[in-house]
Design a protein with these regions (language model features):
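Conserved GNAT acetyl-CoA-binding A-motif
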Residues: 103-115
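Conserved acetyl-CoA-binding loop-helix of GNAT-fold acetyltransferases
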Residues: 82, 88-101, 120, 124, ...
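A conserved beta-turn-beta hairpin within the catalytic core of GNAT-like acetyltransferases
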Residues: 69-78, 87, 134
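Conserved GNAT-fold acetyl-CoA-binding loop/helix
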Residues: 21-43
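Glycine-rich acetyl-CoA-binding "A-motif" of GNAT/NAT acetyltransferases
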Residues: 61-64, 121, 133
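A short helix-loop-beta-strand connector motif used in the catalytic cores of GNAT acetyltransferases and
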Residues: 43-55, 64, 76
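A short beta-loop-alpha structural element at the N-terminal edge
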Residues: 1-18
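Conserved beta-strand-loop-alpha-helix junction that forms the acyl-donor binding cleft
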Residues: 113-122, 144
């Protein structure tokens, strides 16, 4: 496996970003199809903003990617995705390790991770890597027409979900 720095959006990356967005929507019960044009636009925005982006190449094929955001020497994993056929083969570990290398280069001990609450695989992955501290929660107003289906409790607070 090779981890390469990405400097321009490619069709392969656009497809993976589109698949990542489909997967994220599925965590809320939304069925959608990959939008490769939107995936390309998203990747181009990351690159234009100067976000470090890396891809994992396995046997000449793109297997996954990670997008990092560096804010005042704090590194956030903005998104990380591995294609189904490459999961559980060390690809996510290699990509996440790259994010940790960036954090270490700033003298930081941790990477901050955006994770959807229903993304149980990612939460389990992060736990195995020692990420067990809940740092922030994101709170917003409901979208027009959005129907929440659950209540999530964090400490003494309850939130629609």
């Amino acid at each position: 496996m090779e981890i390469i720095k990405i400097t321009q959006a490619t069709d392969y990356l656009a497809q993976m970003v589109a698949l990542f967005r489909v997967e994220l929507r599925s965590y809320k019960g939304i069925v959608s199809k990959p939008n490769v044009d939107a995936g390309r636009e998203e990747m181009e925005e990351y690159l234009a903003a100067g976000f470090p982006v890396f891809a994992a190449i396995v046997d000449g094929e793109y297997a996954g990617y990670v997008v990092c955001r560096v804010d005042s020497e704090v590194v956030w994993v903005e998104s990380i995705f591995v294609k189904d056929e490459y999961r559980r083969h060390g690809v996510a570990t290699a990509l996440h390790s790259k994010a940790e290398e960036i954090a270490a280069s700033y003298g930081e001990e941790t990477v901050y991770n955006y994770v959807h609450p229903n993304n149980h695989r990612m939460i389990a992955f992060l736990r195995k890597r020692g990420y067990t501290v809940l740092n922030l929660i994101e709170i917003r107003k409901p979208y027009g027409g959005e129907k929440t289906t659950k209540i999530i409790k964090v400490g003494e607070n309850e939130f629609d979900y």
